[in-house]
Amino acid sequence: GGISGICAAVSAARAGVKTILVQDRPVLGGNASSEVRLWILGATSHMGNNNRWSREGGLIDEILVDNLYRNKEGNPVLLDTLLLEKVRNEPNITLLLNTAVYDVEKRSPDEISKIYGFCSQNYTFYEISGRLFCDASGDGIIAYRAGAAYRMGAEEKQVYGELFAPDKGEYGELLGHSIYFYSKDTGKPVKFVPPA
């Protein structure tokens, strides 16, 4: 249910494929949701170039233009709603929010036949069968459980010849935890009461 998962699901649905979009959170958007607030940047901001003439096309552009028109203030909760509407408007998509994939079943060494999910909100277990599966989870749970090769952290630029990729040690291997807070000027002192 992140941006890449939404785009994959909507594209498949528009091509006539019956699609199930599984999202482990209560909102869509992944890192771009109101829970994290890493805005959809794509080509417009890669390695700090902030190229105002760069622009994503396709579904990303459709989402960004719709958001710009309907959400002029950039409210992250409105983006959540817009993304939910985008998915719900596709009759070929079944959406499973608050559902975490935890295992896979394979019909052969190289082919997944089923994934298993659990919705913590209504205690429902899901068995989802299909011919194609897209792992856009961010942590690669489907690929990992299927036995695919994987790496943790960022690869160095020479691995794939990516000019904008970081050099060794340029940033840490894994993302840390984050704490989000708001602050505002109330125009007067505010008493802080620490939690008990």
Question: How should these model regions be labeled?
Answer:
Residues Y69-E73, E127, K168:
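Active-site rim elements
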Residues N122-L132:
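Core beta-strand elements of the Rossmann-like FAD/NAD(P) dinucleotide-binding domain
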Residues K114-C119:
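Short beta-strand segments that buttress and anchor functional surface loops
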Residues I142-A196:
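Rossmann-like dinucleotide-binding core of oxidoreductases
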Residues S11, V17-K18, Q23-D110, R151, ...:
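Conserved N-terminal/central alpha/beta ligand/cofactor-binding core
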Residues G5:
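N-terminal Rossmann-fold NAD(P) dinucleotide-binding loop
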Residues R131-L132, A136-I141, A146:
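Glycine-/small-residue-rich beta->alpha transition segments that form the dinucleotide
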